[in-house]
Regions:
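C-terminal motif of bacterial Sec signal peptides marking the signal peptidase cleavage site
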Residues: 25-27
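Conserved HGGG/HGGXW glycine-rich cap/lid loop of the alpha/beta-hydrolase fold
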Residues: 82-133
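Active-site loop/oxyanion-hole signature of alpha/beta-hydrolase fold enzymes
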Residues: 125-164
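Flexible "cap/lid" loop of the alpha/beta hydrolase fold
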Residues: 174-177, 181, 189-219
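Active-site nucleophile elbow and catalytic-triad environment of alpha/beta-hydrolase enzymes
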Residues: 246-261
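Short beta-strand/loop motif that positions the catalytic acidic residue
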Residues: 265, 271-273
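Conserved loop-alpha-helix segment in the C-terminal half of the alpha/beta-hydrolase fold
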Residues: 273-304
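Catalytic histidine-centered segment of alpha/beta-hydrolase-like enzymes
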Residues: 304-314
């Protein structure tokens, strides 16, 4: 299910059809930061369960209740005015970490990743736009891939990292594959729980198209001052008040993201998928034969589901730490 609270894991393939239905009808509120579901995120998390403030015209809407928290952490300001929050911990080669859907930069620390990795790396964590303490654009263009990538590189600049290792989980890994394919600044990449090929396809693509078509006109009407919330159905009104409209816009941005093939990736990359992640492993079957001669090395995480591939830090880092050590370069 799609969570409308940050901190939960949400999945796209193949369960996005259920996610889309939930978003179209009402808000689905998560009550656990470690849900039993193994649904996979490939999209930014939904907004807070508090009623969102009216989106700024042509700008961004901060997450409800996060203004004070955002003031306590460093931020960069993107060219479109979106604030991107980040944190830096540890010393050593730079390691930039991209969180999964329904998560924030804090998720890495809560699971113990920062304590482990900051012993040998300068760990740089950010809230992707639409997440945590970062701003929330209210148009599809606000989540364009080039803007998301520019945010990440700007955070690396602010942290003093000319080049860096990359670690992404879920949606963060989906974004990370574009960086690994496009930027010479990536020394190496660890991509966990992501899929090669299109960002979205098939029923998922159809669901996202419907979601964006439903909610984008409402946001435009709100900005024009013509939206009458009272005229919405009870389900749509509840969903609106839970921030689903902005979530639909963020999710819909994936429709515009291009596919990535293993051969496109320029940096040495460790691709990890839980062996018990059925849809993830189905994707692996499609691409495993295309890895020869590329920079991508695939390893299954024995016995782990999608959720486990983030939650169970010890077996995951048993593969990650040796790979990072083998590709590590001095901090720069």
């Amino acid at each position: 299910m799609m969570s409308v609270k940050t901190g939960a894991l949400v999945r796209c393939h193949p369960a996005m059809a259920l996610v889309a239905a939930a978003l179209l009808c009402s808000a689905c509120v998560s009550t656990s930061t470690t849900p039993k579901t193994t649904e996979k995120p490939t999209a930014p998390p939904a907004t807070s369960t508090q009623k969102p403030a009216a989106p700024a015209r042509g700008g961004t809407t901060p997450a409800a209740g996060t203004e004070a928290a955002a003031a306590k952490v460093p931020t960069i300001t993107a060219a479109d005015g979106t604030k991107i929050a980040y944190e830096v911990s540890g010393t050593g080669p730079a390691l930039l970490m991209l969180h999964g859907g329904g998560q924030s930069r804090k998720s890495w620390a809560e699971r113990g990743y920062v304590d482990r990795l900051a012993k040998k790396f300068t760990v740089i964590r950010l809230d992707l736009r639409g997440s945590g303490d970062s701003g929330r654009p209210d148009t599809p263009a606000g989540y364009a891939l080039d803007k998301v990538v520019a945010d990440i590189l700007a955070v690396a600049d602010a942290a003093g990292a000319k080049r860096f290792h990359l670690y992404g989980f879920g949606h963060g890994a989906t974004i990370g594959r574009y960086l690994a394919a496009q930027s010479d600044r990536v020394i190496s990449a660890v991509l966990v729980g992501m899929e090669m090929g299109p960002a979205v396809s098939g029923p998922v693509k159809e669901a996202l198209t419907s979601m964006r078509a439903k909610w984008q006109p409402m946001l435009e009407a709100q900005k024009a001052g013509t939206l009458d919330i009272k005229k919405l159905s009870p389900g749509d009104r509840d969903a609106w008040e839970h921030g689903v409209a902005l979530s639909a816009i963020a999710l819909g941005a994936l429709l515009d993201y291009p596919p990535v093939q293993p051969a496109d990736i320029k940096a040495p990359t460790l691709w990890l998928v839980g062996a018990a992640d059925a849809s993830g492993m189905e994707n692996v079957k499609q691409f495993e034969g295309k890895l020869a001669g590329t920079k991508v090395t695939f390893k299954p995480l024995a016995g782990l589901s999608y959720t486990d591939s983030f939650a169970r830090i010890d077996p995951v880092l048993a593969d990650v730490e040796p790979f990072l050590a083998s590709t590590a370069q001095p901090a720069s």
